[in-house]
Amino acid sequence: MSNLPIINFINFNQNGSCISMGTSQGFKIFNCEPFGRFYQDEEGGCGIVEMLFSTSLLAVVGMGDNPAMSPRRLRMLNTKRHSVICEVTFPTTILSVKMNKSRLAVLLQEQIYIYDISNMRLLHTIETSMNAQGIMSMSPNSENNYLVYPSPPKVINSEIKDHATTNNINIKKTDAVDDTIKKDYSLQVPSDITGQQQQQQPGVDPATSNNTANKIIKNGDVIVFNLQTLQPTMVIEAHKGEIAALKLSADGTLLATASEKGTIIRVFNVENGSKVYQFRRGTYPTKISSLSFSKDNQFLAVCSSSKTVHIFKLGKNTVDNKSNELNSDDEIEDDLVPRYGDEDEEDEEIDEEATSINSNHSSKEPVVDAKRSTVGRMIRKSSQRLSRKAARTLGAYFPIKVSSILEPSRHFASLKITTSSNQPIKAIAAIDDPIELSIKEYPDLFEKNASNNGDYQNSDTLTMVPIRVVSSEGFMYKYISDPERGGDCILLEQYSLLSD
């Protein structure tokens, strides 16, 4: 086991049909269906290996094992001819590479270089803030040709004075009155929680410290950049905290986002920036490693460091109505509970976790098959019953829109990656088109679930959605999920990406 290479990079191609993997020895390319390795190179460690759909074009960045494999050098390879098409060297380390059939984007720590992929001509350079995690996403669709990346942090000055009270609020009429107000503020010394007056620390300017305390750093915005016009189109206010993951849908119309906290997943309309879905992944913070849409935008897969993949069902809801009502809920929430600092951001995220879109559910409303009994589900049911009871009780005292905040929107299906390691892992999922599965081919597999689902016994074939997951441990898992009932996904196949 010690001779196995170290995995530096792993990803699906744009349509989820292939897997590219960079290791300490080189890189490998796999086909998903049927599974098998069809290309391998061992010239040196690779940190980035990106494919252009299922073509022979590869974008490869080395790990610095030798001068030819510098982490600052991008190599465009043709796997059919086993040749290097071109090489481009950048001033700093390359953190991410994304491409579609018309554009190629190279992300450095503080710049994004955009090229015409047909001739590798530099079209534009974007100056950004520090993006050490290499977070960006490009639309695979050349018609809705967008690039998204985190916006530079914004400093917001709070209008609330730290020691202001309702006893000294005055209406500003003249400069003299303004001077009086300033004097009043400067004379006041707030009391601490013990009731004793706080002493000013030597060498600290009260005015400076107050200005610093009243500043809030907002770093949860996302910039949408049009790769055709080479202009930014909008800034989406996605989260309060730092962005951890971004993903554009296959058609480039939807954007999924997650913050560092990892409890809330949001989906936005790329055309107008409106929020169309909001999902609660869980209660406890976790690191989101990837987001991925199905090709038809019906499902969204969220992979986290807790080795769990949550599947959310988006359905075909009306975007405008949903976004308007969600925005109204946000306004109500902001009016009810004003927030002014980092200390309250966690509470705000918890409140926002409960923001519901239940009042907008279409006929495609996610339904989890309640007949499937598991210990985890019984525990969740008990917890959810208490939550709903509390929501109904509190909802009786609030307006309809406010009470809707109390009902969370949960995942439609989920799976737990099978691993013996106790360490956090990174995973990426790809949701394929539905398939017809013969029960006779997998009798043992469906026998375990037949007792909890009568439909398995009354038909020869089942319509299932394949979900492929690749992990940083070097495995590819193929799960299947019921597109109507959801629930626990069933493991169908498992392969090692490291073994020969």
From Swiss-Prot:
It is found in: Preautophagosomal structure membrane; Vacuole membrane; Endosome membrane. Keywords: Autophagy, Endosome, Membrane, Protein transport, Repeat, Transport, Vacuole, WD repeat. The keyword Nucleotidyltransferase does not apply. Residues 362-372 have a biased composition (Basic and acidic residues). A motif (L/FRRG motif) lies at residues 279-283. WD repeats lie at residues 238-278, 283-322. InterPro entries: PROPPIN (IPR048720), WD40/YVTN_repeat-like_dom_sf (IPR015943), WD40_repeat_dom_sf (IPR036322), WD40_rpt (IPR001680). One of its GO terms (cellular component) is vacuolar membrane. Its main location: membrane. Pfam families: PROPPIN. Disulfide bonds: none annotated. It is a peripheral membrane protein. Residues 192-212, 320-374 are annotated as: Disordered. The PI(3,5)P2 regulatory complex regulates both the synthesis and turnover of phosphatidylinositol 3,5-bisphosphate (PtdIns(3,5)P2). Necessary for proper vacuole morphology. Plays an important role in osmotically-induced vacuole fragmentation. Required for cytoplasm to vacuole transport (Cvt) vesicle formation, pexophagy and starvation-induced autophagy. Involved in correct ATG9 trafficking to the pre-autophagosomal structure. Might also be involved in premeiotic DNA replication. Belongs to the WD repeat PROPPIN family. The N-terminus might form a beta-propeller domain involved in specific binding to phosphatidylinositol 3,5-bisphosphate (PIP2), leading to the association of the protein to the membrane. The L/FRRG motif is essential for the cytoplasm to vacuole transport (Cvt) pathway, for the recruitment of ATG8 and ATG16 to the PAS in nutrient-rich medium, and for its recruitment to and dissociation from the PAS under starvation conditions. This is Autophagy-related protein 18.
